[in-house]
Amino acid sequence: MTSNTVYASPYANNIKNMENSEITGLAKNRYTDSETQLAIAKCHYRLGKEYLAANPNVTKEAADELWDSRGYVFKSMLLSRGRIKLKKKEYAEIYRKYFKNNSRSHWRMMQAFLGGSYWQNTSSSNNRTPAALLEEIYADLGEDETQRSYTLERFIDHPNCSLNLALRISTMPDPPQQSYYHRSFADLRQKALMKVAEITKREELASR
């Protein structure tokens, strides 16, 4: 439903009168004012709201409005970019409510909890998924996913990857059948071992 709120911004006040392409342009623009962002977050045009969720300068107020929308699409986009900060237990609650055992949302789940991909111009560096939940997600992966080195590499690249998870990936056997999608597992294991060394060194320094 379109909001009846009166804004100071002429753009915000006229969102309801704009063409979809005009809303999209404002949603993508990093310098769109906060009132216009909020008006877009409250408008009916879903694609415009998706572009807003992907905007690196989305405001907290607009992000909160998108977060409160039904479903998991906006939630996954905001989580992947670190736009929403949750308590540790809330990450697990969101995962179990919207993504666990839901094959339709697998790609969105990976985006939400492991961060965006290189082709999305995002990374896992802003992603705050707790280590315990990363281990739960790893345990929930289907057999096909555990045979894709790219999927496993996203766990290693996550800033909260645990020592236990890195060790498990470092001992992964080669998949029974290599395919176009399977990168070298030897390289993957080596990267996981480097992560083990990194975590071990960090923990040793922290304990001094």
Residue locations for each model-derived region?
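Alpha-helical scaffold segments
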Residues: 2-208
